[in-house]
Each structure stands twice: as C-alpha cells, then as structure tokens.
Amino acid sequence: MSVEVEYLQHEDYLYRTSKLKEIRDLGINPYPYQYTDCLEVQEIRNQFVDNELGDSEAAFRKETPKVRFAGRLVLFRSMGKNSFGQILDNDAKIQVMFNRDFSAVAGLAADAGISPIKFIEKKLDLGDILGLEGYLFFTHSGELTVLVETVTLLCKSLISLPDKHAGLADKEIRYRKRWADLISSEDVRKTFLTRSRILKLIREYMDQQSFLEVETPILQTIYGGAEATPFVTTLQALHAEMFLRISLEIALKKLLVGGMSRVYEIGKVFRNEGIDRTHNPEFTMIEAYAAYWDYNDVMKCVENLVEYIVRALNNGETQVQYSHLKSGPQVVDFKAPWIRMTMKESISVYGGVDVDLHADHELRKILETQTSLPEKTYVHASRGELIALLFDELVCDKLIAPHHITDHPLETTPLCKTLRSGDETLVERFESFCLGKELCNAYSELNDPLQQRKLLEEQMRKKALNPDSEYHPIDEEFLEALCQGMPPAGGFGIGIDRLVMMLTDAASIRDVLFFPVMRRIEAKKD
C-alpha cells in the first residue's frame, strides 16, 4: 500500500523537478551550502535610497556602489535585452535587472550550451532563492534597482508561489501552510513582525521595572494555578504520569518564597479544551509576581505595560482601531488609567441587575430568562458562582474600552486574598477586559498557608461531587513552600496571543499564531 501525496502529482511540481535535473546536468548545485557576507535588503534600502547613485549607465560602468544580498524571486518579467525581477528578503523588496551582456550565472560553464540570460529566463522560477551581486542605480521612475553582475541559485523551489494578487484565499490553507502565507502576504508578515516586537516590548518594560525573567518546567508531576483540563503524558524513564502545565503560577510563587522578589515568565501553556476564535489549546502567556505589591499595584503595572506597548507600536498614540466586533469597528484608547469597577457594579451598569437586591433563586431566574445557559450550570450554584455567571453572560461582551473588573466572588479562585474590608465573600482579584474579551487576570496573592489549604481542600470536596469539574489537585510542595513563608505579593497573567489580536486587528487567534492547532488531514492511500 502506497501513500499518495497530492502536491507530488501537480503538473507544476513535475515541470520544476525536470528543470532541477537540467540544472544539475549543467554542473550547477541547486542547493549550495552557504552564501555569506550579505547585506539585508532593508539595509540596502536604508543606506542608499536617498543617495545620488546615478542611472543604469553608471552601473554598467561599475561606478555605483556594489552590493551582495540574497532573497526569494517573487516577480519576473523579460523585456528583450533586459529582464527585471523583484527579490523579497524578510519584509523588504528590491528590484533587480538582469542584462544579456552583463549578468553571469555562478557555476555556469562558458560551453554549457545556454547563455546566462537564457538560463535566468528559462531555468529560474518564481519562488527560487537567489544570491545576487551587482551595482545600484535608480531607474527613470526613481526605483532603486540592482544591475546584477552575478546570480547564484541558492535553492530551487519546486512548488509555485500563491497568486500575487489573490494570495491564499482559503483560510484553512493559510493556517496549514503558513510558510506560503508569509511569502504571499505582506499583511501577514507585518502581523508576525508586530507579534515579535510586542514580545520584545513586554520584556523591555518588565526589565525596566526590575523584574527578573525566569524559566519554569513545562512538564509537571501535578498541575495547578488555573481551572482547566490538562494534557496528560507518560515519562517513560520514571514510569510516571506527567502533565503539560496549565499555568505558570505555582512555580513562580515558589520562587517568591526563595527570595526572588520580582519574577516573570513568558511561555507556552496548554489546556485540553475547546478551540474557537480566541482559544487555542497551546497558547503564550506572561505571568509576573512582585513581592510587597497588592492588586492595586498590579492594576497600575498592567495598564502601564499595555500603554507602553501601544505607544511604541503607534508612534506615541494610545488609540487602536479594531474591526472585528459584531457591533462594527471600534477605536479603543489604552491610555492609563483604565476604567475600574467592581464585578457587582459592572453587572448593575451593563447588565441592569443589582445583585444585592436579589435572592439566590431570583438570580437563577434571571439566568434562566436572560441567558441561554443550560439549567445544570446554575441550578446548584452558590451565590458567588451565580454572580460570576451573570457577569460572564450579561457584561463581558459589553466591555469594549479597557476595564479592570475588581472584587470577584470567593468561589472564583482559591489562590487570592479576601477583601481587606472584611467581606470574606469577595476576593482581591481583578480581570482586565477590552473589546469584549478578558485580557488579564490578577490577584492580591494568598500567602496564608492554613487558609490556602482550607480553600484547596474545599475545591477537592467539590471535585468529589462533580468528577467533570476543572478543580485541580492539591500541590503539597506548594503548600510546604507557603509554610516556609511567602511575602505579600501581587501577580498577573496576560494572554499574549489575545493581546496581539487586539493590537494587530486580527479576527482570530489563528491569525496571530504561526502554526495554530488544526485537525489532521490523512494522506490518501492507494
């Protein structure tokens, strides 16, 4: 039984592989080992675009600057004695000109039976990666161009490029074949360059605030720090069940105990749950913890961090347009301070329900009549859980401008201190929302080991009553660390993929992940 790979049957692939054989028969290695001492195309443009270089005649006389660079051939047209191409390198392009009497092909023998210009026109294809040396000049229209003296084939492409105008129209193909998407779409390249810059800016800001970047284990013997279903695997060497982390929290708090007063980690987190427009099972987070802070300090840090990023990306401006809300395009201002209100206040303002005026059975009735939640999600819910459900259903998608929603019900987390005012039904937790989605989760961290054990054990009792619940097992090492003594602290977690979505006007989380999780496609079998 053989497996049929679709692209191997394409006419274009077969045609290009025949060219590949012809190139090898000419004594040219189509996949050489290196091409060094190159400038990047953007460097060339930056250095020479405003210079007085002269015209093509000066280039033919070799009187203009000589450059050496490499990139992918993305456009080509033959015009008799001259042929013109466009080379893409990272996110920069430059025009090149091949001349019948001037341009040579590296490795092509004089008696090969084919001239250099014919080799360029007949044996090269769009998508080939080339090394080029030549002389700079400006065309009559002012286009910076390289008169190519020598072209070196660095990689023969065997699959044609996507259409230069349509690109990859099928979103699923774009996500599966991101390499082709990046080649064909300048907007896609810009999105991922912005993502990389956002990561750099996060580190820049956190370093300025005296935080230490650390790395903690991805494989864990016990999972915790969030309410989520883990991925489970087996460590063969120890015959032990292991989990991919669902949060960075517990390990970072252990470092606080160890005397590292400000720590953060940017890393992958894994949750074996649903896939939708804003969720991918593998995603990137930053979590940070600062000794001697509380959630008020963290609020300032979070909004200042995001404002810092937005200003850096937008020439000092704090406003960003987002186009993918059901209500239509919105302009959001990330300038600090952000709107702050308690969860109860937000339900009153945006949901029209003052929860303090309603008994539990009345809150259940509101959930029944004003939401599409199944009855089982709230019929046995505690008062705090009912309040959290009302917020999720009536408020979240209305939080377009940046909001900090504070003072959540105790039932929403076991890792947070109760309100210092003495109301033990609420905790010093806030979540930051923007464009109808959660962006950040943060606490005044609980450091009382006895209270922490009590809350975790209460979660375990709930788990026993509902085996399908997401409450995590107790981490005894974490409790032991708390007994050693953890300073008062504030901490936060931000979903970086979702932040990138907001700042690049992306409709889906898949648009900001190089390789999002996709359903596997089985190869055809004979």
Curated annotation (Swiss-Prot):
<protein>
    <recommendedName>
        <fullName>Lysine--tRNA ligase</fullName>
        <ecNumber>6.1.1.6</ecNumber>
    </recommendedName>
</protein>
<keyword id="KW-0963">Cytoplasm</keyword>
<comment type="subunit">
    <text>Homodimer.</text>
</comment>
<comment type="similarity">
    <text>Belongs to the class-II aminoacyl-tRNA synthetase family.</text>
</comment>
<dbReference type="GO" id="GO:0005524">
    <property type="term" value="F:ATP binding"/>
</dbReference>
<dbReference type="InterPro" id="IPR018149">
    <property type="entry name" value="Lys-tRNA-synth_II_C"/>
</dbReference>
<dbReference type="GO" id="GO:0004824">
    <property type="term" value="F:lysine-tRNA ligase activity"/>
</dbReference>
<dbReference type="InterPro" id="IPR002313">
    <property type="entry name" value="Lys-tRNA-ligase_II"/>
</dbReference>
<dbReference type="InterPro" id="IPR006195">
    <property type="entry name" value="aa-tRNA-synth_II"/>
</dbReference>
<dbReference type="InterPro" id="IPR004364">
    <property type="entry name" value="Aa-tRNA-synt_II"/>
</dbReference>
<keyword id="KW-0479">Metal-binding</keyword>
<keyword id="KW-0460">Magnesium</keyword>
<dbReference type="Pfam" id="PF01336">
    <property type="entry name" value="tRNA_anti-codon"/>
</dbReference>
<keyword id="KW-0067">ATP-binding</keyword>
<keyword id="KW-0030">Aminoacyl-tRNA synthetase</keyword>
<dbReference type="GO" id="GO:0000049">
    <property type="term" value="F:tRNA binding"/>
</dbReference>
<feature type="binding site">
    <location>
        <position position="438"/>
    </location>
    <ligand>
        <name>Mg(2+) 2</name>
    </ligand>
</feature>
<dbReference type="GO" id="GO:0005737">
    <property type="term" value="C:cytoplasm"/>
</dbReference>
<dbReference type="InterPro" id="IPR012340">
    <property type="entry name" value="NA-bd_OB-fold"/>
</dbReference>
<dbReference type="GO" id="GO:0000287">
    <property type="term" value="F:magnesium ion binding"/>
</dbReference>
<dbReference type="GO" id="GO:0006430">
    <property type="term" value="P:lysyl-tRNA aminoacylation"/>
</dbReference>
<feature type="binding site">
    <location>
        <position position="431"/>
    </location>
    <ligand>
        <name>Mg(2+) 1</name>
    </ligand>
</feature>
<dbReference type="Pfam" id="PF00152">
    <property type="entry name" value="tRNA-synt_2"/>
</dbReference>
<dbReference type="InterPro" id="IPR044136">
    <property type="entry name" value="Lys-tRNA-ligase_II_N"/>
</dbReference>
<dbReference type="InterPro" id="IPR045864">
    <property type="entry name" value="aa-tRNA-synth_II/BPL/LPL"/>
</dbReference>
<dbReference type="GO" id="GO:0005829">
    <property type="term" value="C:cytosol"/>
</dbReference>
<feature type="binding site">
    <location>
        <position position="438"/>
    </location>
    <ligand>
        <name>Mg(2+) 1</name>
    </ligand>
</feature>
<keyword id="KW-0648">Protein biosynthesis</keyword>
<keyword id="KW-0547">Nucleotide-binding</keyword>
<keyword id="KW-0436">Ligase</keyword>
<dbReference type="InterPro" id="IPR004365">
    <property type="entry name" value="NA-bd_OB_tRNA"/>
</dbReference>
